[in-house]
Regions:
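A structural motif detector for short, solvent-exposed N-terminal "entry" segments of globular domains
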Residues: 23-60
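Exported/periplasmic cell-wall-interacting domains
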Residues: 82-162
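Bacterial N-terminal signal peptides that target proteins for export
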Residues: 1-7
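Short, solvent-exposed loop/turn elements at domain surfaces
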Residues: 40-42, 49, 61-64, 86-89, ...
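Well-ordered beta-strand positions in beta-sheet-rich domains
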Residues: 51-53, 75, 109
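Bacterial N-terminal signal peptides
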Residues: 9-17
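N-terminal post-signal-peptidase region of extra-cytosolic proteins
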Residues: 22-29, 56-80, 144-145
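Pocket-edge structural micro-motifs
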Residues: 35, 44, 56, 79-80, ...
Length: 162
């Protein structure tokens, strides 16, 4: 009986931090994109270090083919951020994976990017819930610069889109 009580207490005390961290940071070291809340969390050791509101593809999630205007779901590598005249910074998501290619998925130029740079009149579009062609957009230049600097400082960084 004493062993059961100790086991029960241990499972209660030690499962709470694991569960709490896994809800916001299932990828404990990387970028976690939560499509239901439209948030991007940068996580280190299972702890959120920064959160940003995001916009996703205007046709929803579950990208399978080029031009479907959906945001892909899954775990992907991130390429080196690059300067973009259109979005300030563009961070390529390595979509599709080799497994997805083998399953017939198509598409390219999916990434995490900043607000449109066309005109300050159009920056509000990036704050709409589903305003991209399948990418993940943050609404402010300083936000994408923060994400890009984090990716540069963490070579081999990944993004989990769920």
């Amino acid at each position: 009986m004493k062993i059961k009580a100790i086991f029960l207490m241990n499972s209660i005390f030690f499962s709470i931090p694991l569960f709490a961290g896994s809800a916001t940071c299932p990828l404990s070291n990387g970028i976690n994109v939560h499509t239901t809340t439209q948030t991007l969390n940068i996580c280190k050791h299972g702890t959120v270090i920064k959160t940003f509101k995001i916009a996703l593809g205007y046709k929803g999630i579950g990208k399978k083919k080029a031009g479907d205007n959906k945001t892909p779901i899954g775990l992907y590598g991130l390429a080196h951020p690059r300067t973009s005249n259109q979005f300030k910074v563009f961070i390529p998501i390595l979509y599709p994976t080799s497994k997805q290619l083998a399953s017939g998925y198509t598409g390219r130029d999916v990434g995490i990017h900043g607000p449109t740079q066309l005109s300050s009149w159009f920056n509000w579009v990036n704050n709409l819930p589903s305003s991209t062609h399948g990418c993940i957009a943050v609404g402010k230049n300083n936000h994408i610069e923060y994400v890009a600097n984090w990716v540069k400082a963490n070579p081999g960084a990944k993004v989990l889109i769920i």
